[in-house]
Amino acid sequence: MKEEKKLLLREVEEKITASQGFILLRYLGFTAAHSRSFRNNLSGVSAEFEVLKKKIFFKALETSGVEMDPEGGEGHLGVVFAYGDPVSAAKQVLDFNKQHNDSLVFLAGRIDNASLSGREVEAVAKLPSMKELRQQVVGLIAAPMSQVAGIMNSVLSGVISCVDQKAEKTQE
C-alpha cells in the first residue's frame, strides 16, 4: 500500500474511533455548493462529511475492529462522522435531504456501537430529539400539576366566596 493510502487509512481509523457514530450516504447530483452547505450544517452538531473510497473506508473499519457489511460495488461513499450526538447528525442529514430534493440516500450507519441499515438510520433521524423528549416529559408532569393547582384555587375561591356571602348575610 502506498504511503498516501496508509496515511489516509490511519486518518479514517482515527475518525472512526473518535466519533460517536457515523452514517454512510450515497450522494446524487451533489454540487460543490451543496457539499459546502452540508458541511456547514453538520459542523453545528459536531459532525463532519467526508467523501471516501469504499475500499479504504471498509479497510479502516476492519482494522478498527468495527464489523459492518460493505455496501456492494466500488467507488466513493459519503460518510458523516458524528463526534457529538449521532442522532442529531442523522437529523441534520434528513433535514438537508428534504431541502435538496433527496440528493442523499442513507445506506447504513453505526450509532451507539450498533450497526444499522439505511432505513433504520432514517427512522432514528425521524425520532424526537433528547431536547424534545425532555420538553414532552416536563409537559406531561406540569399538566397534572397545573390542573391540581387550578382545582385547589377553585376550592379556595369557593370557600372564600362562601365566607364572603355569610359575612354579607350577617351584616344585613
Curated annotation (Swiss-Prot):
SUPFAM superfamilies: Ribosomal protein L10-like (SSF160369)
Entry's Gene Ontology cellular component terms: cytosolic large ribosomal subunit
Source organism, top-level taxon: Bacteria
Pfam families documented for this protein: Ribosomal_L10 (PF00466)
MF annotations from Gene Ontology: large ribosomal subunit rRNA binding; structural constituent of ribosome
InterPro entries, sorted: Ribosomal_uL10, Ribosomal_uL10-like_sf, Ribosomal_uL10_bac, Ribosomal_uL10_bac_type, Ribosomal_uL10_CS_bac
Listed GO biological process terms: translation
CDD domains referenced in this protein's UniProt entry, alphabetically: Ribosomal_L10 (cd05797)
Keywords associated with the record: Ribonucleoprotein, Ribosomal protein, RNA-binding, rRNA-binding
Similarity comment text for this entry: Belongs to the universal ribosomal protein uL10 family.
Subunit record text: Part of the ribosomal stalk of the 50S ribosomal subunit. The N-terminus interacts with L11 and the large rRNA to form the base of the stalk. The C-terminus forms an elongated spine to which L12 dimers bind in a sequential fashion forming a multimeric L10(L12)X complex.
Function according to Swiss-Prot or TrEMBL: Forms part of the ribosomal stalk, playing a central role in the interaction of the ribosome with GTP-bound translation factors.
Protein name, per record: Large ribosomal subunit protein uL10
Lineage: Bacteria, Pseudomonadati, Chlamydiota, Chlamydiia, Chlamydiales
Gene name of the record: rplJ
